[in-house]
């Protein structure tokens, strides 16, 4: 049981260090960029499916 407590303590220290440093702001920016790229790809595939989907069936 003490082993798991120490493991979670170390994980919480690492998460706290990353959360309270500037790393979190940089990763949030990257996550926003990846989100918008995923939305654009989704919209492109949606338009393609609607345009070509009728021709397939």
From Swiss-Prot:
Keyword field: Cell membrane, Membrane, Plasmid, Transmembrane, Transmembrane helix
**The UniProt record lists the keyword Transmembrane:** yes
Q: What is its main location?
A: membrane
Q: Which InterPro entries match?
A: DUF1328
The subcellular location is: Cell membrane
The topology of this chain with respect to the membrane is:
Multi-pass membrane protein
The organism's superkingdom is given as Bacteria
Task: Give the residue spans that cross the bilayer.
Answer: 4-24, 33-53
Offer a single GO CC term for the protein.
Answer: plasma membrane
Query: What family does this chain come from, according to its entry?
Result: Belongs to the UPF0391 family.
Q: NCBIfam families, per this entry?
A: PRK13682.2-5
Query: What is the protein name stated in its UniProt record?
Result: UPF0391 membrane protein RB0084
Species source reads Rhizobium meliloti (strain 1021)
């Amino acid at each position: 049981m003490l082993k798991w407590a120490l493991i979670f303590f170390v994980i919480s220290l690492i998460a706290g260090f990353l959360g309270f440093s500037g790393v979190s702001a940089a990763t949030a920016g990257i996550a926003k960029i990846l989100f918008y790229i995923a939305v654009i790809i989704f919209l492109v595939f949606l338009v393609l499916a609607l345009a070509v989907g009728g021709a397939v069936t």
